[in-house]
Curated annotation (Swiss-Prot):
The lineage of its organism: Viruses, Riboviria, Orthornavirae, Negarnaviricota, Polyploviricotina. Residues 165-248 are annotated as: RNP-binding. InterPro entries: Flu_matrix_M1 (IPR036039), Flu_matrix_M1_C (IPR013188), Flu_matrix_M1_N (IPR001561), Flu_matrix_M1_N_sub1 (IPR015423), Flu_matrix_M1_N_sub2 (IPR015799), INFV_M1 (IPR037533). The gene is M. A motif (Nuclear localization signal) lies at residues 101-105. Homodimer and homomultimer. Interacts with NEP. Binds ribonucleocapsid by both interacting with genomic RNA and NP protein. May interact with HA and NA. Cannot bind NP without genomic RNA. This is Matrix protein 1. It is found in: Virion membrane; Host nucleus. Residues 1-164 are annotated as: Membrane-binding. It comes from Influenza B virus (strain B/Lee/1940).
Amino acid sequence: MSLFGDTIAYLLSLIEDGEGKAELAEKLHCWFGGKEFDLDSALEWIKNKRCLTDIQKALIGASICFLKPKDQERKRRFITEPLSGMGTTATKKKGLILAERKMRRCVSFHEAFEIAEGHESSALLYCLMVMYLNPENYSMQVKLGTLCALCEKQASHSHRAHSRAARSSVPGVRREMQMVSAMNTAKTMNGMGKGEDVQKLAEELQNNIGVLRSLGASQKNGEGIAKDVMEVLKQSSMGNSALVRKYL
């Protein structure tokens, strides 16, 4: 995959699946695909995207600034504050040393990625802030390599947290994870489905999940809710009360 393709993949790995992720993916493919765009407008879009966390906004914003460093008229607080607000004085010092001594000597994406892999996330955040404030001191490949290494660490943390919740010894936590996954699937189908039948089916699924939450699903059968939602989406001939009859 190309340099920009790798960057898009790492950035999207940070975001939870859903309609917002699909919309962001389309934007990233346009920005990194060579189409001309206004940097300030793109940054405003990222800043106001509610489905993104502060760190995610900062990383995505920094990545497109690395594409067009000469077009940036001013530094953005929504980028600098999350990058500089994490970690201790010691980790920030490590990030500064990483940026000033090691990354300045790098010339390629993979070289920067491999060096960044050996540092903790808070140090990489501060290193990225230094790169963002002094873009002329680093090549675009080095800046994107450092950013992608950080994205991999962040995505790994999120995956472990999600897996821990999915394997929780508390049945209620496992059941709610299934409920959330099922609701996200139904809401995405409702938002992106173009056919009236698909949207109607998605609304029925959301109502069914609401009933299950209100009245309570059995501990034993709660595990299969998300899978059943997917099956209902594939086989729309099922009755709208199928889930309720099965789990109550």
